[in-house]
Amino acid sequence: FMNVLQQCYRYTSRTAAEALENCIEIPQTRSIPSWPSVHFENTGYAVLRSDARTVVIKYGPHGGGHGHPDKLSISVHNGDKEIVSDMGTCAYGVPAFTQWYRKTLSHSTLSVDAKDQSESTGKLLSFKVRKDGGEVLAEAPEAYPGVRMNRKLVLKKDKLTDIYTALSDDEHLYDYVLILTEKPVFS
């Protein structure tokens, strides 16, 4: 567990009062662990990793009262910082909780007809681990009535390929949303 704490203290000083209760010095570390890609079947998350780079996709159960309309949403970390973010949530009594955080548009996923996704459970179709990353394919066939959505992510070294597909017999307005933490640079 010490290596996890060392990673935490790369960005945060250990100056809280709680640090006095533990006399162990936990130095910051600059080395970034190389963890393998992993699938958390029970919670419906898949994590692709390549060196320090991480991509997380959420496809699983809705989560009841704590759930968000965010099937197939992703977050991306480049080893230094999060570059595609899942904003999480705020206190339940704050107006932004229902006006922003509980909206599909506040997540890095697909919005259909400017509406929120339905409470639904997605499905993992494939998960492949490679030494230099991996590949995941997940679907959310019930997030929007009549629309079958799937997302394929391929992480290979420092390159991420994101293929989002939405199929329907009817015409819809599709918004592909990425919550970026920085202004993108196009080359």
Q: Where are the regions a protein language model picked out?
A:
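CBM-like, beta-strand-rich accessory domains located in the C-terminal region of large
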Residues: 1-9, 90-187
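Carbohydrate-active enzyme catalytic cores, enriched for enzymes
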Residues: 1-84
